[in-house]
């Protein structure tokens, strides 16, 4: 994990990678919990027997489950010591490029697109690539916008 002492340190890093997370296992239990939380019980996610005979050869994670992992992936990729809180401001683009099969591992690679100072903090636009272990193509690519406050 990279640790930046001050939020202002990120201003000079626009266009550069700012961190890469640890690998995270996507197991059936996580997929089932997400299905319960969202009400999305499609068989490609929660029925291992049927999904094994389906188009992906195994159950796959919901696309929105993959996207929802961004906070935990951010947390293991980098931290800014003087930031007391952060809030999601939005997403500019999201693409689900590859399916995430049960038993796969994913990680986040983060590139700072822009740093905009705000009163008491900054707005960060970050290109988040959720990589899929063993695959050339990522699972998900998203441009996130967050506000961090010191």
Write out the residue ranges for each language-model feature.
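Catalytic strand-loop segment that frames the active site of acyl-thioester-processing enzymes
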Residues: 1-61
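HotDog/MaoC-like acyl-thioester-processing domains
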Residues: 1-13, 99-150
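A generic structural signal for short beta-strands and their flanking turns/coil linkers
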Residues: 14, 20-22, 30, 40, ...
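Generic structural detector for well-ordered beta-strands
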Residues: 19, 23-25, 95, 145-147
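Hydrophobic beta-strand-centered segment that forms part of the acyl-chain substrate-binding groove
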Residues: 54-58, 68-109
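A solvent-exposed, acidic/Ser-Thr-rich amphipathic alpha-helical stretch
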Residues: 64-66
């Amino acid at each position: 994990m990279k640790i930046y002492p001050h939020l202002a340190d990120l201003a000079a890093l626009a266009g550069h990678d700012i961190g890469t997370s640890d690998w995270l296992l996507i197991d059936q239990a996580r997929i089932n919990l997400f299905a319960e939380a969202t009400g999305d019980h499609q068989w490609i996610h929660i029925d291992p027997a049927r999904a094994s005979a389906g188009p992906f050869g195994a159950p796959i994670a919901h696309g929105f489950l993959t996207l929802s992992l961004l906070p935990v992936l951010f947390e293991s990729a980098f931290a800014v010591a003087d930031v007391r809180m952060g809030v999601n401001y939005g997403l500019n683009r999201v693409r689900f490029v590859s399916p995430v099969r049960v038993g796969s591992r994913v990680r986040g690679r983060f590139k700072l697109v822009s740093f905009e100072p705000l009163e008491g903090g900054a707005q960060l636009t970050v290109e988040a690539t959720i990589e899929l272990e063993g695959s050339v193509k990522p699972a998900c690519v998203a441009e996130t916008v967050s506000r961090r406050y010191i």
